[in-house]
Amino acid sequence: MRERIAKLTSNILNPFLVSLVLILLLSFRSTSSTLDAVKWLLVSIAISILPVLLAIIYLVRKQRLESPFINVRKQRTKIYLVAGVCAGIGCIIFPYLGAPPTLRAAFVAGLSAVVVFMCVNLLWKISLHTAFVTASVTVLIILYGSIAAVTVVLVPLIAWSRIELKHHSPAQVIAGALLAALIAVVVFYLFGLL
């Protein structure tokens, strides 16, 4: 029963779904019209989530990755590179497209996290599930204040699930959470959004 709950938690709070929800909330929070929000949502998904997801699907089908949620540390490098290129493209073109500051900050935070986590990944595996949830919770609290504080319960929940499934150690989930929160706070502060 515990394992089923842990799997369900990990599947629901996966990096792709968490990113999608965060981009959706940021798009609607940072624009004045629904049309603009939908535009930035679609552009953000096309630049960030979709290419990474397609790369993972391709590599899984070619049996170069064990699964969509890459548990083998050495297999993560390819995905870090794809994610880094996508985030870098977003960081470059968003200012020219007039993207809202919150979305630009999110892409800079994403690129920063990819670089840091890719370096860590050379020697040690870190929990991306926990990192994505923690970064998203941090950004939501920054933007929405105390009303978003209720989302903090998702951090220990996802951390527990990753440990329960034996995909990560307690140190790996704690490191993922702390680094992700720190990166989000620093980037949003530098953008004047904190």
PLM features: residue spans?
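Juxtamembrane helix-capping/reentrant segments at transmembrane boundaries
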Residues: 9, 66-83
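Membrane-embedded catalytic cores of phosphoryl/pyrophosphoryl-handling enzymes
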Residues: 100-194
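Alpha-helical transmembrane segments
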Residues: 36-51, 109, 139
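Short, Lys/Arg-rich, polar N-terminal cytosolic tail immediately upstream
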Residues: 1-7
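Membrane-water interface of transmembrane alpha-helices
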Residues: 52-63
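The first (N-terminal) embedded transmembrane alpha-helix
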Residues: 9-29
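Core segments of transmembrane alpha-helices
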Residues: 18, 81-92, 131-134, 180
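Short, hydrophobic transmembrane alpha-helix segments
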Residues: 26-39
